[in-house]
């Protein structure tokens, strides 16, 4: 069975966060999102809205399509 999209998105977000040298707390502060929410998203435990994906993409200096292109 194909890997859950939530897991793939979470892995992508974690990889970007680590590449930027950010902790989950730093990422949450920079993006204005809750740390525990982001932690759950990174683990593939929560769905993420398109609005929050756009916030995250902008926070990393990416377009939404670029953010999701490696998912």
Residue ranges and their predicted role:
Residues 1-8:
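A detector for short, charged/polar N-terminal pre-domain segments
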Residues 32-46:
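Recognition helix of helix-turn-helix/homeodomain-like DNA-binding domains
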């Amino acid at each position: 069975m194909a890997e859950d999209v939530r897991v793939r998105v979470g892995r992508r977000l974690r990889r970007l966060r680590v590449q930027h040298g950010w902790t989950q707390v730093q990422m949450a502060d920079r993006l204005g999102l809750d740390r525990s929410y982001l932690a759950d998203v990174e683990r593939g435990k929560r769905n993420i809205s398109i609005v929050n994906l756009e916030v995250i993409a902008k926070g990393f200096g990416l377009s939404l399509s670029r953010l999701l292109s490696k998912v």
